[in-house]
């Protein structure tokens, strides 16, 4: 086997339809990361003049004359072919040792286990368990378990089979909230590069990326029609009408409860019901005040949320989503996701990747809300094999750990 640098065209031809490919292993992503302190190269593994594996390698200097590499979502090759993996690993280490690399970080999109959505128990794939052991023997350092979101990319992903997705496949809460009468004031529409700035306002608090990054992201992937920005547009006149009708109904129902409570002032259930209505009515009144303010500012329609997604082969991957938090009474995040997923189902895609969830399925999980929201769409839950460092130069690697440079680079 020979490992050598290959052209972008050679890389694209091999990788674009390979089963191991992801949007992280594309020349588009390489172009993007060139703008953010990474250099890049494409490598190919040839055996008997046949290309049998490739990878995008992002790299940067981390110390004088020392570099590290990153193969996002791993090398593109058959990991289960032991002989191939052994030879590829050996030749890759030799190739990058000559370039003064300390290590190459990888996080392959290879399934380690499938998690039962009800019992939350793992069904580990025996071949994947053997693979992890084999990789360790070959010099791949297995890193943190990444139960939450400690690593470069999520270890646990929720993926919807769009062939099976319908109104009966989601849980009841999800269906009710995504089909609420309030959603009649909402419309899903396709955005453009011009809308990224508005969209960024909804995601900036949960992303460590800049506005420029997302504008570049859209620009780069849009060249191949691989990216969509789907937005929610609200009609405030319709919204106001619906909210006023809802407020009238709730006030009438609260008056009925108040009358019952006056007749039974020591009934605790009635008291709790009354206070619950008081809170909901106060929230509605707050929203109506806010809508009236926007209408006075001549803002009859406004974008209030969106999803950035990548389309690749038969799969759509959610990159990031966000919503305007002004209206706590409007659960339009369910509407946003349900409509987006339905949109791609109609277009004929097979899978929708909801992106990462936490691997902690207990009640004490700090990301319980995120998990519950995504699981309400009844996805399949997969655990990938995790993040590894392929150590190229053990001396350099240990010095980098001992000096704290790796912690500074990767732990935020």
Regions found by a protein language model. Give the residues of each.
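A conserved beta-strand-loop-helix scaffold within acyl/acetyltransferase catalytic domains
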Residues: 5-48, 52-64, 140-151, 157, ...
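C-terminal catalytic domain of photolyase/cryptochrome flavoproteins
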Residues: 31, 41-42, 356-412
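Alpha-helix boundary/capping detector
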Residues: 37, 244, 344, 399-401
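Intrinsically disordered, low-complexity, positively biased terminal segments
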Residues: 47, 65, 76-115, 125-126, ...
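A short, hydrophobic/aromatic-rich structural module that often spans a beta strand
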Residues: 119-129, 152-168, 325, 393-412
């Amino acid at each position: 086997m020979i490992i050598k640098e290959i052209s972008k065209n050679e890389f694209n031809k091999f990788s674009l339809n390979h089963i191991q490919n992801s949007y992280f292993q594309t020349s588009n992503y390489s172009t993007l990361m060139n703008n953010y302190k990474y250099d890049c190269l494409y490598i190919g593994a040839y055996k008997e003049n046949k290309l049998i594996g490739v990878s995008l390698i992002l790299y940067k200097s981390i110390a004088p004359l020392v570099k590290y590499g990153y193969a996002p979502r791993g090398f593109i090759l058959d990991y289960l072919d032991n002989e191939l993996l052994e030879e590829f690993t050996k030749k890759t280490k030799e190739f990058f040792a000559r370039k003064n690399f300390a290590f190459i970080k990888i996080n392959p999109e290879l399934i380690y286990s499938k998690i039962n959505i009800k019992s939350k128990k793992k069904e580990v794939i025996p071949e994947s368990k053997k693979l992890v052991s084999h990789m360790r023997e070959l010099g791949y350092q297995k890193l943190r378990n990444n139960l939450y979101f400690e690593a470069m990319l999520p270890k646990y992903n929720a993926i919807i089979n769009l062939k099976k997705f319908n109104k009966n496949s989601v849980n009841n809460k999800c269906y009710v909230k995504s089909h609420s009468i309030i959603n009649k004031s909402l419309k899903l529409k396709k955005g453009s590069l011009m809308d990224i700035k508005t969209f960024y306002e909804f995601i900036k608090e949960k992303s460590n990326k800049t506005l420029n990054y997302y504008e570049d992201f859209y620009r780069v992937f849009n060249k191949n029609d691989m990216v969509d920005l789907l937005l929610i547009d609200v009609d405030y006149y319709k919204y106001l009408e619906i909210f006023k009708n809802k407020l009238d109904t709730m006030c009438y129902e609260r008056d009925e409860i108040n009358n019952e409570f006056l007749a039974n002032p020591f009934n605790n259930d009635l008291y709790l019901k009354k206070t619950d209505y008081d809170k909901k009515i106060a929230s509605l009144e707050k929203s109506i005040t806010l809508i009236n303010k926007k209408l006075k500012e001549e803002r009859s329609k406004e974008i209030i949320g969106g999803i950035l997604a990548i389309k690749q082969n038969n799969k759509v991957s959610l990159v990031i989503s966000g919503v305007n938090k002004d209206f706590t009474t409007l659960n339009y995040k369910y509407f946003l996701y349900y409509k987006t997923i339905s949109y791609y189902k109609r277009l004929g895609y097979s899978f929708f990747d909801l992106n990462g969830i936490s691997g902690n399925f207990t009640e004490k999980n700090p990301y319980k809300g995120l998990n519950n929201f995504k699981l309400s769409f009844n996805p399949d839950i997969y655990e990938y094999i995790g993040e590894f460092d392929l150590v190229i130069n053990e001396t350099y690697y240990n010095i980098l750990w001992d000096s704290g440079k790796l912690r500074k680079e990767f732990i935020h």
